[in-house]
Amino acid sequence: MHDPLTRRRLFGVTLGAAALAACSAPGQPPAPAGSTPPQAVPPPSSTPPPSSSPHPQGPATELVRSSSGRPQVALTFHGAGDPQVARQVLDVVHQHGARITVLAVGTWLAEHPDAARMIRDGGHELGNHTWSHPALSGYAAEPMYAEIQRCRDKLAELTGSPGNFFRQSQGQHATPEELVEAGKAGYARVLSYDIDSLDWKDPGPAAIRAAVAKARAGSVVSMHFGHPGTVAALPGILTALADRGLTPVTASDLLA
């Protein structure tokens, strides 16, 4: 087994600067429609679900890509938006025999609970992408934890598991504070990414394919449900990966 590259190991000396940058990082996807403001997030429940970690960790470790050398990539999707578009994404990856990881927004799961089963039934992986997709790095500790905890509890309610990964919202890399609160919520690993498809900007299928073409063995790619351009780009992306000998697998498999 090979150790995945971690931001904490490679970039520990710059985490403080990253935290400041993340608080005002431009060019990140906005919160989905219907997102709740910080004050709308209730305090965490006093009793976590049985499926959550009984032994809270210290600060989580941020994972960006794998260093295993295996010819694999992880296509990771932010779970929000029209569930019919999500189904189209799942249909395409099924046709190509690929496996993906979906970091789901809690409010989306609450509104579309069948989506969790649809994803899991396809052999894909689910993880936590906050409750309401806010600019999380700007939150104080308590509401930041509540965003992670509420989505964790919804995942556990719908699937029996809180998922293996948390991903921060509206930021490519986690801040030190986000790593601390994710650890408190029972997540040992925060899943960031080294390749951003920028599909949330709706740049068109060709631009999305060109962005993902930068992926290499071990890459974690960020993509989104809810965007028709992503669906249109996906067959070409999967074909190009196959032509390069790269297999899309879940994040857990990539980082094993």
Which residue stretches match the model-derived regions?
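Bacterial lipoprotein signal-peptidase II cleavage site
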Residues: 23-32
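Ser/Thr-centric signal marking residues that sit
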Residues: 6, 14, 76, 86, ...
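C-terminal domain-boundary segment and adjacent tail
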Residues: 38-50, 55-69, 96, 109-111, ...
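N-terminal secretory signal peptides and thylakoid transit peptides that target proteins
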Residues: 1-18
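Active-site beta->alpha N-cap acidic-glycine motif
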Residues: 52-139, 143-147, 154
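Residue-level preference for short coil/turn positions at secondary-structure junctions
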Residues: 6, 69-70, 96, 122, ...
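Catalytic domains of cell-wall/extracellular-matrix polysaccharide-remodeling enzymes
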Residues: 88, 134-242, 246-247, 252-256
